[in-house]
Design a protein with these regions (language model features):
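Short amphipathic alpha-helix used as the core "switch/output" element in two-component signaling
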Residues: 65-76
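Active-site beta3 strand of CheY-like receiver
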Residues: 48-54, 59
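Non-catalytic signal-transmission and effector/linker regions of two-component phosphorelay proteins
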Residues: 1-7, 110-129
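Acidic catalytic/metal-coordinating carboxylates
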Residues: 37, 63-66
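Residue-level signal for the "D+5" position in two-component response regulator receiver
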Residues: 34, 59-62, 97
Length: 129
């Protein structure tokens, strides 16, 4: 297996979800880091470069909407995917208003992985050899 090319930050306060995302996305040759809080995610984003964010809507120290707004301000142009159990249309609209690129309802992991592949295929990291 080659070195991972694209870097993903997954933010979810449920350890099992974070672990599952790390395993499944790593199998697709992505470098994956996880965070369980907004504070942890912002600290990682400030010191590392990511090509994509996967965010949960509910976090212990704020909302995914707040985090998405912060991340899009700190790192403009980096896509944010919401992967959340809150599948209501109002939440989807709020996520897009906060800067989300995509919104996938849990537990639809296949759609999430397809969305990650599609968004990262458009990024420079996917073209690196």
């Amino acid at each position: 297996m080659s070195d991972p090319k694209c870097r993903i930050l997954c933010v979810d306060d449920h350890f099992d979800t974070s672990e599952m995302l790390q395993v499944l996305l790593s199998e697709s040759d992505y470098a994956v880091q996880t965070a369980g809080t907004m504070e942890e995610a912002c600290a990682l984003a400030a010191k590392s470069t990511f090509d994509l964010y996967v965010l949960d809507k509910r976090l212990p120290d704020g909302t995914g909407m707040e985090l998405c707004e912060r991340l899009t301000f700190l790192t403009p142009g980096i896509p944010c995917i919401f992967y959340t159990g809150d599948a209501y249309e109002v939440h989807r609209r709020q996520a897009f208003a906060a800067g989300a690129t995509a919104y996938v309802a849990k537990p639809d992991i296949e759609t999430l992985i397809e969305t990650v592949h599609r968004l990262l295929a458009e990024r420079e990291c996917a073209a690196e050899v």
